[in-house]
């Protein structure tokens, strides 16, 4: 585990974004942990979050030309990541996002910000079913000269859907692009094992991983 990954997990726990207990997911599964990126809801938290996304980009080495934040949650994520890349990695890159509904007046269209062209890195919080990413892929495919370079998310739950694959593995298979994350469940487990206060949650998370993991 990289230092920035350990720092991110601690940061997520401190902000109440990553919690341990008993949570019912939309899928109906009872999960021993829950991740709610909507709680990165202050200026300081968003700035720190951008630095973690930027660190994951630097670590991945994925080449790309533009950052894309899917509406709505991806918009501030792409913005703060672009700021962090410029301020901490000396990479001043364009970024853009989509509207849920296209405007008929003013600047018009469904895309806002830099032109969506070249290799596109999609920024989001998590991939649950993959539906949102599939919609984004259609948007990118509709733009001349644009193609997806990859997807970056905060947490990879490493959890299968209804079949044998996770939603992330299905996206990688169907579109031939990498999906990278700041951290995965593997690193969360490693963090729990090393933390005296949180170690009590390790057996439940390991059992969940054994049942639903990929």
Swiss-Prot record:
Pfam families: Pribosyltran. Keywords: Glycosyltransferase, Magnesium, Pyrimidine biosynthesis, Transferase. HAMAP family: PyrE (MF_01208). This is Orotate phosphoribosyltransferase. GO terms for cellular component: cytoplasm. The gene is pyrE. Orotate binds at residues 34-35, 128, 157. Its cofactor is Mg(2+). The keyword tRNA processing does not apply. GO terms for biological process: 'de novo' pyrimidine nucleobase biosynthetic process; 'de novo' UMP biosynthetic process; pyrimidine ribonucleoside biosynthetic process. GO terms for molecular function: magnesium ion binding; orotate phosphoribosyltransferase activity. It is an enzyme of class 2 (transferase). Belongs to the purine/pyrimidine phosphoribosyltransferase family. PyrE subfamily. Homodimer. Catalyzes the transfer of a ribosyl phosphate group from 5-phosphoribose 1-diphosphate to orotate, leading to the formation of orotidine monophosphate (OMP). It catalyses: orotidine 5'-phosphate + diphosphate = orotate + 5-phospho-alpha-D-ribose 1-diphosphate. Its EC number is 2.4.2.10. Pathway: Pyrimidine metabolism; UMP biosynthesis via de novo pathway; UMP from orotate: step 1/2.
């Amino acid at each position: 585990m990289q230092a920035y990954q350990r720092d991110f997990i601690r940061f997520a726990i401190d902000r109440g974004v990553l919690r341990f207990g008993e949570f019912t997911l939309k899928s109906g599964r009872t999960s021993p942990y829950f991740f709610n990126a909507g709680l990165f809801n202050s200026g300081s938290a968003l700035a720190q979050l951008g630095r973690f996304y930027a660190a994951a980009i630097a670590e991945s080495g994925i080449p790309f030309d533009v950052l894309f934040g899917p509406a709505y949650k991806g918009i501030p994520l792409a913005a703060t990541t672009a700021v962090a890349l410029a301020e901490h990695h000396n990479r001043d890159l364009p970024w853009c996002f989509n509207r849920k509904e296209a405007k008929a007046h003013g600047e018009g269209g469904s895309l806002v910000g830099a032109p969506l062209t070249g290799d596109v890195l999609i920024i989001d919080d998590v991939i649950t079913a993959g539906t949102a990413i599939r919609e984004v892929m259609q948007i990118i495919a509709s733009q001349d000269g644009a193609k997806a370079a990859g997807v970056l998310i905060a947490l990879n739950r490493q959890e299968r859907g209804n079949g044998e694959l996770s939603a992330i593995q299905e996206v990688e298979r169907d579109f031939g692009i990498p999906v990278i994350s700041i951290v995965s469940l593997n690193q969360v487990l490693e963090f729990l094992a090393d933390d005296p206060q949180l170690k009590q949650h390790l057996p439940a998370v390991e059992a969940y991983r054994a049942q639903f993991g990929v």
